[in-house]
Amino acid sequence: MRTAGSAMRTATVVAAGLVLLAGCGGGASGGKGGDGKGDVAGKGERPGGPARGASATTHLKNIPEVGAALRARIPAGSRQVVAVYGKGVNSAEATVVLYDKGAKGWDRKGSWAAHNGRRGWTVDHHEGDKRSPVGVFPLTDAGGVLQDPGANLPYTHSSAFTPPSYWSKNTRHDFDYVVAINYNRVKGTSPLDPTRPQGQSKGGGVWLHLDHGSGTSACVSVPKAGMQALLRALDPARHPVVVMGDAAHLAG
């Protein structure tokens, strides 16, 4: 259980928030906008996601379609994994699946159609390349324009998440809810913290956030109901991580 002090952190520098927003969503255009309709337990999956029957959704020895190299990067203490299955190295379409580890193995808890960087994936992400970074990254901090929906992760509620007015209208609600992906950031800080330990050129501000119907600058976007489900499920005591990439890189 979070203390009152850790449950909500207020952003103090709006300018810093704009730097992070520019790194996350940019002026994405097109798409139908997030409709808030999440899918669970395999419904609504996009091509590229796991295609398995109900018998293969519980008591799994390993996270499906993730090879030994990335499995080795999942911390031993991690008992929650958000797997992002990209359709292809140059595709913006993906499927997000939440796995939770119990006494008998990994259980699939939910699945949502998603988007990643509009140019696909990369193992060497740089600012402005419009590709999402491949890898395994902790999930420690959350926030958004909207009030905390019942998150277990520390949640920063702030209007500083609001996209700039000059962005496309279909992106206006992208950051109603976000979970920071710990790529080139300092864990334990607000998602709005602009600090980039590897330098500005390596990009940053990579988040899970609401979907607007098309690719992002580097983030992974999920329907509103999916973001609400993730925020309520992800538990810092279970050391959640995201494992993300296209099919070839995930399996490699």
Where do the language-model regions lie?
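Cell wall/extracellular polymer interaction/catalysis modules
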Residues: 2, 17-20, 25-210, 232, ...
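Preference for short coil/turn "hinge" residues that link or interrupt alpha-helices
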Residues: 14-17, 67, 215, 227
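Extracellularly exposed regions in secreted/surface proteins, prominently low-complexity, repeat-rich
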Residues: 206-252
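N-terminal export and membrane-targeting signals
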Residues: 1-14
